[in-house]
Amino acid sequence: MSDVPKTVKIKEVGPREGFQFEKGAISLADKISLVDALSGTGVKSIEFTSFVSPKWVPQMADAEQMIAGIKRAPGVAYEAIWLNEAGLERAAKLRDSLTLRPMFSVAGSDTFMRKNTNRSVDERIEELPGWAERYQKLGLPWLDVGVMAAFGCNYEGDVEPRRVVTVLQKAEQKAEACGSRLGGIGLADTMGWANPLQIKRLVGTVRERWPNTPIKLHLHDTRALAVANIVAALEMGVDCFDTAVAGMGGCPFAAHKGAAGNVTTEDVVFLCQEMGVETGIDLDAMIDAGQLAERVVGHPLPGKLKSGGNLETYRARARAAVVTV
């Protein structure tokens, strides 16, 4: 496919992925200030906290306080994640303040799945009916199934597209057997193995099997190919991406400490702007949010546009200079 989408949907995941990855304490006020700044950028979906055990993820101990403290912008979906039934119950109590997305995560690698959940991929899929039932009780008769390590794994090597399709087929069969359905597919390059050709191969293979199911990509910039992979995905017609302001985040189970986190929101918005793809996001406001994110965490973050700036600013200066001359 040579044509790229006219518009794309971007979910901002920086606060959730970024805060949980930080070792130093971050104040509730600083967390809220970043979410509020993101709310003013035009992004339509912000994943900003997790309902998880504070014992294991202390940065997420203030999930309820964050939800109570943020200033909601019209038209913005505020989202969270959960890893177990207790987390979902906490989220469900606040569904007037949250957009609940019925999600179920698996992986293309048994080793990575075990490090994440202490279960094999097949054991994890056996848990899907229980999740489907919980979501159905909340009036959500579908699941979005995300495949972590969909392109490669630091423990097992390359992950072939047929492996990902097999995992998704098993998940779909379990969902349909209990009256649910596959609502969306997420493909995550959790450890930064993907290259543009792999993106096209996997997206093409998945779309051949599920031509009418939305596909979302969650890409990490571990080996500096995330933006190139976004271009490849756009060329395949993918129109939904997870991104993180200033490149916040990472994966604690990926076996490479200090590696770059998620693909940077402002870099992707800039890419789309230059390619004529509409995101609905104010790039200058997102650059400001990226600079704020860096101040909040107290150390440099990998996003490029924080220092490089928006080309439209330079174009405007150049036009003004020509007029003056």
Regions found by a protein language model. Give the residues of each.
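Catalytic cores and adjacent flexible loops of soluble metabolic enzymes
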Residues: M1-V325
